[in-house]
């Protein structure tokens, strides 16, 4: 074996591996040049002496290709049976990898701004610039018909606050939305509170939810009250105060007869005696008091 190694080393130094990239036949199959060595020996195709040539892919400083970038696609790959299969070198531009990654970074950063643009377009109609200041555009006012206003007013006199089912039922019957009914009731309540605060309407005459039959008009005096009739006659300039023995009806007829003297005789002829009129009025006053 020592003689074989001695013969092997001079054959490697003979200048077969002087090229920076040796051929596959000289580097991987040296057993064909020395028929004395068996093919299955441990020194086959991968033995290099320290003084010999550089291994595959190594560039010495003295070579012409030293310092240059090596193309990884120029290497030769061996198949199963040991034959070298050369693949042509491809540039990066053929595969579309010539452009660096940072060129795509700008487009990636612009994606969120493009998605947020429709949101700004949707929100723009709600805000309008007036004299350089943003102003929110108000929705148009709802115009209620006379029928709707009458129905809402009747319901407000019954109760000032509506529950959800009641509001939904009222809105469906009037052809309005629940929001419109709610806003109308809110405006009506605020208007009533403002009137009460200014003193135009006393609190006792304002409609309340506890008393649905409340009436805002003052009570009218009864017709059969003697005091009310005497008050009404006292305001008249030509009226005379009633005497104790005359009824209010007879005194009123006498006053009217003084205005029309021609009809005084006919009125006095049809008048009953004063005592007959005082008797039923006394009975009526006794029943009231």
From Swiss-Prot:
Assembly mode: Interacts with XRCC6 (Ku70).
CDD domains xrefs: homeodomain
Polar residues bias spans: 32-46, 206-220, 242-253
Chain positions found as Phosphoserine: 34, 217
Protein name: Homeobox protein DLX-5
SMART domains on file: HOX (SM00389)
Chief localisation class: nucleus
Ranges of the DNA-binding region feature: 137-196
GO biological process: anatomical structure formation involved in morphogenesis; axon guidance; axonogenesis; BMP signaling pathway; bone morphogenesis; cell differentiation; cell population proliferation; cellular response to zinc ion starvation
Assigned keywords, A-Z: Activator, Developmental protein, DNA-binding, Homeobox, Nucleus, Osteogenesis, Phosphoprotein, Transcription, Transcription regulation
Name of the gene encoding the protein in the UniProt record: Dlx5
